């Protein structure tokens, strides 16, 4: 076994086909981080026949007196199930990095442990996960444990929606509450539009207070993953909002008038009481719908072309769509 430096194309070829592949383990991501203060290195591991059996993008910085710390984002890309091979690799890597002035190497490979449904029920378990953890411990990697919050560089849990079904099946799989909110948004005039690189400043206005990254980070991300980044905006069509607000108000007015007529005609005390209660609720709705109509009308006057209300930054990688930020 030897540890070598890989050329960019060698690294990409290996990384793109590894079982633990991730967009974090790509030359594109490395170039992004290089622009923001990190040095990068493409590490490779070859066997006695010079076949590549492991690789990783390493990000590193000098911290003091020529000493450095390194991080392998969603790496190392290696067969952790082979305990003997992992131990040999770890020992060689430790000696090499120590000679080169590295104090610390952090890794967080994508090793699936289990798949849960929305309620937390376990649907599938990776039988290798416990073996891998024990092999890493035996090779003297310091295990951070099953973290629950934000103790690590990358999150322990990832939310996943399978998109291999038709759109109606996917929609019907959502909770009733979520489906209601989607329908309500559509009725209110919310539309989804796709943006481009020129719209990054607009996107940035939505996220700059939530996240510490500068706008240049997203511009560089878009550039390095060229052709695989999509910007989406939720836009309120103010004209549609007024039309639908008016419909709701007018419909409730009809219901209210009908209730008033029924109250006048009711001879039974219990029936009359029930109708009065229904009218009270209808009166409340009319008041709400009237306020919404006034608000919608003012929005239309001030924003005749609509209003952008939210945005998301999506990366398409390895037959999946990753929501980078929203």
Where are these regions (language model features)?
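A conserved beta-strand-loop-helix scaffold within acyl/acetyltransferase catalytic domains
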Residues: 3-49, 53-65, 141-152, 160-166, ...
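Acyl-donor binding region in acyl/amide transferases
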Residues: 67-151, 202, 291, 304-309, ...
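Active-site neighborhood for divalent-cation/phosphate handling
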Residues: 155
């Amino acid at each position: 076994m030897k540890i070598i430096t890989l050329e960019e194309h060698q690294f990409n070829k290996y990384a793109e086909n590894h079982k633990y592949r991730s967009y974090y383990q790509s030359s594109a991501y490395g170039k992004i981080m290089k622009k923001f203060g990190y040095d990068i290195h493409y590490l490779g591991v070859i066997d006695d026949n010079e076949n590549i059996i492991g690789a990783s993008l390493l990000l590193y910085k000098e911290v003091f007196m020529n000493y450095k710390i390194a991080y392998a984002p969603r790496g190392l890309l290696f067969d952790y199930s082979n305990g003997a091979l992992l131990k040999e690799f770890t020992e060689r890597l430790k000696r090499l990095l120590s000679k080169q002035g590295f104090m610390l190497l952090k890794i967080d490979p994508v090793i699936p442990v289990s798949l849960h449904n929305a309620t937390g029920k376990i649907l599938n378990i990776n039988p290798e996960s416990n073996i891998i953890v024990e092999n890493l411990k035996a090779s003297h990697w310091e295990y951070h444990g099953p973290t629950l919050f934000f103790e690590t560089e990358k999150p322990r849990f990832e939310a996943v929606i399978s998109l291999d079904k038709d759109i109606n099946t996917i929609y019907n799989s959502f909770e009733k509450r979520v489906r209601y909110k989607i329908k309500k948004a559509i009725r209110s005039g919310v539309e989804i539009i796709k943006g481009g690189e020129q719209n990054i400043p607009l996107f940035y206005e939505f996220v700059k207070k939530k996240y510490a990254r500068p706008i240049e980070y997203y511009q560089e991300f878009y550039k390095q993953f060229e052709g695989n980044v999509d910007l989406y905006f939720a836009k309120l069509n103010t004209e549609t909002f007024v039309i639908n607000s008016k419909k709701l108000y007018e419909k409730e007015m009809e219901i209210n008038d009908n209730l008033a007529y029924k109250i006048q005609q009711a001879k039974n005390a219990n029936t009359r009481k029930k109708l009065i209660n229904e009218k009270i609720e209808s009166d409340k709705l009319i008041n709400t719908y009237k306020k919404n109509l006034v608000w919608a009308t003012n929005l239309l006057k001030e924003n005749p072309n609509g209003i952008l209300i939210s945005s998301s930054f999506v990366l398409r990688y390895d037959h999946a769509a990753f929501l980078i930020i929203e």
